[in-house]
Design a protein with these regions (language model features):
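DPxDG-like acidic metal-binding loop motif
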Residues: 1-14
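An extended, acidic
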Residues: 22-138
């Protein structure tokens, strides 16, 4: 995953080292252009600070380097936008899944992925619980 504006490139080998959690309240990273209901619901349920940022790669890497703890995307994206960020996040030991908790599946005929979750392992169940509750109320 390349972040040219920061002069950074992330790969799976060597795997990034995930820093220890540094905040009392989790930080959720979301789209700079839109704030999906699911992200708002997770932020409210977990008492998260929310930060907006650009590309999917930049948001996922913010979790990898510890600038954020949760990235929820439910607006859909193509496999080529999420495959490398998912691989790097998994290599770093993060939780990566669809927002319903099912695994990400790549190399499908239809390249569209409706949603994406990257978070610290210890936050996966609370985030998925909040996402399930969000789906029930929408």
């Amino acid at each position: 995953v390349s972040l040219p504006a920061l002069g950074l490139v992330f790969a799976t080998d060597p795997a990034p080292v995930l820093p220890p959690q540094q905040r009392e309240q989790p930080r959720l990273i979301t789209s700079r252009n839109r704030n999906p209901y699911s992200a708002v619901d997770v932020a409210n349920a977990l008492g998260c600070d929310a930060v907006r940022l650009g590309s999917a790669g930049a948001k996922a890497m913010a979790v990898v380097v510890g600038e954020a703890d949760i990235y929820v995307h439910d607006g859909g994206m193509y496999q080529w936008d999420s495959a490398a960020p998912a691989a790097v996040a998994l290599a770093a030991g993060l939780h990566v899944s669809r927002t319903d908790g099912s695994p990400m599946v790549f190399n499908e005929r239809d390249p569209w992925l409706p949603d994406f979750l990257v978070c610290r392992q210890e936050l996966a169940e609370p985030v998925l619980d909040a996402l399930r509750a969000s789906r029930r109320t929408r």
